[in-house]
């Protein structure tokens, strides 16, 4: 949904998403900050929030002033069991907002009260929930013998003719996901990445952020992710997504990648029970070549970011600012539309401006029953029964394997791969807005039904490559 076009540095400088209105913003006192309530229903209890203080305000420049402001707000909140609420500063994000954490979980009403009281400070620009995002897939135990999405049917992405002239050479795709596992059909195309999970428990490596993006497993036990949550095996979601983009090809092994000569920068932001918005937005900035405090510079800035993740609610300021930051550096941001069979306007970050929002279709060319839809879907890609690289471990990593998954998580990397193909043959790197326009103008009609909005059609690799300037 591009609405800006930004210049891009020449490719030789590389080794290798305007702010939308927030429909859930509600009125607050005059001169106070905006309150985005869209994340309040995302979790049964809430304890992490993101606050952006206005540039130049005392709270923005003085930790002591910010601490005094937070203590003042906390003192107005009702005590529980005789204990006052604690409100602590965790860290500053790459774009200058502050991550806050309460010392106990709050219900929806308590969290809304806290957010409104924080926003009543005239120095606050906005406040929102540090929402948890999740991989956007529906696992399928059936393994297919072929990759229909890369085939020759009218429902495929029509990639085989494109491979005669474009294979993704020289293009870096950042995959913000669960990390990656070692796989003989992937390893040769993987560059150094980073682990952005700041919560050591969620990360399972006991040390928070570090330079190792290896997927430690995202298995959960019953109740671990909230009351009533079920147990689940590790998904190895990032490995599956990466394989669809750039699995090694012509090696007489396994599967093919859409852009099989592109390189993957794996960025770990999802762990046990998902991943926090504050970690993901830092990952977006870093992936595109921006600076993140305490994290070494990314030696391989991405021309494409794939985010097969999301959660409920409209686009938050944190997401939009991070996406705009990436787009300003020339990085195209591809996002899964979500698997709720609902309007994408209520799913984030797919509802953000300046992203390519991707719906899922079946091998018959119809909208997948689970796929989100709507007027802001940009394009569709194969997302039902998609075979790709995986791992056999049910909890911690086991041996390399292959499996079929369903989800808009699987559709998005097909599109990200096509973007890599396009950039690899462009005479100079295309702006994100130009990439989106090219994909829409060359898309093929869906041969099946989608009455609710599936964008311009099925992404058409050969058509896009042939019309790349």
Labelled PLM ranges:
Residues 158, 162, 176-186, 215-261, ...:
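Flexible, small-residue-rich helix->loop connector segments that border functional cores
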Residues 280, 314, 335-355, 359-377, ...:
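Active-site-adjacent substrate-recognition loops and nearby beta-strands
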Residues 178-231, 260-273, 345, 391-406, ...:
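Peri-catalytic substrate-binding/gating loops that frame the active-site cleft of hydrolases
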Residues 28-148, 163:
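Primarily auto-inhibitory N-terminal propeptides
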Residues 35, 91-95, 115-172, 180-189, ...:
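Protease zymogen maturation seam
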Residues 266, 286-289, 294-309, 315-318, ...:
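C-terminal subdomain of the subtilisin-like protease fold in secreted/lumenal serine endopeptidases
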Residues 16-25:
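Bacterial N-terminal signal peptides
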Residues 242-246, 258, 265-273, 305, ...:
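Hydrolase catalytic cores
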């Amino acid at each position: 949904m591009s609405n800006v076009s930004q210049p891009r540095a020449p490719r030789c400088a590389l080794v290798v998403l305007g702010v939308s209105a927030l429909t859930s913003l509600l009125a607050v006192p005059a001169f106070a900050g905006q309150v985005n309530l869209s994340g309040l229903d995302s979790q049964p209890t809430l304890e992490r929030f993101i606050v952006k203080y206005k540039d130049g305000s005392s709270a923005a420049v003085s930790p002591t002033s910010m601490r005094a402001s937070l203590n003042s707000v906390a003192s107005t909140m009702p005590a529980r069991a005789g204990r006052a609420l604690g409100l602590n500063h965790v860290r500053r994000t790459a774009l200058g907002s502050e991550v806050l954490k309460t010392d106990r979980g709050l219900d929806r009403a308590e969290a809304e009260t806290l957010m409104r009281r924080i926003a009543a400070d005239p120095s606050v620009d906005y406040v929102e929930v540090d929402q948890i995002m999740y991989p956007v897939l529906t696992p399928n135990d059936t393994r297919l013998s072929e990759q229909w999405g890369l085939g020759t049917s009218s429902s495929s992405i029509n990639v085989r003719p494109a491979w005669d002239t474009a294979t993704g050479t020289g293009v870096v795709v950042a995959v913000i996901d669960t990390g990656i596992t070692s796989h003989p059909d992937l390893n040769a195309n993987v560059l150094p990445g980073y682990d952005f999970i700041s919560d050591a428990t969620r990360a399972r490596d006991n040390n928070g952020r570090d330079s190792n993006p290896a997927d430690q497993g995202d298995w959960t036990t019953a109740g671990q992710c909230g009351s009533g949550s079920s147990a689940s095996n590790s998904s190895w979601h990032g490995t599956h997504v990466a394989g669809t983009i750039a699995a090694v090809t012509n090696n007489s092994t396994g599967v093919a990648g859409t852009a099989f000569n592109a390189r993957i920068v794996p960025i770990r932001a999802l762990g046990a029970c998902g991943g926090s918005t504050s970690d993901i937005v830092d990952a977006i900035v870093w992936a595109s070549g921006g600076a993140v405090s305490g994290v070494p510079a990314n030696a391989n800035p991405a021309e494409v970011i794939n985010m097969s993740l999301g959660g409920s609610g409209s686009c938050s300021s944190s997401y939009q600012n991070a996406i705009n930051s990436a787009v300003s550096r020339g990085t195209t941001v591809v996002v899964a539309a979500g698997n709720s069979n609902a309007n994408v306007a209520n799913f984030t970050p797919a509802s953000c401006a300046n992203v390519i929002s991707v719906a899922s279709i079946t091998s018959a060319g119809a909208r997948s029953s689970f796929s989100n839809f709507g007027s802001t879907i940009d394009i569709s890609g194969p997302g039902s029964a998609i075979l790709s690289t995986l791992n056999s471990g049910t909890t911690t990593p086991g041996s390399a394997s292959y499996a079929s998954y369903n989800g808009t998580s699987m559709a998005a990397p097909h599109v990200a791969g096509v973007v890599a193909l396009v950039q690899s043959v462009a005479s100079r790197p295309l702006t994100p807005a130009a990439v989106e326009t090219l994909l829409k103008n060359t898309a093929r009609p869906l041969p099946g039904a989608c009455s609710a909005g599936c964008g311009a059609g099925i992404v058409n690799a050969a058509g896009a490559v042939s019309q790349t300037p």
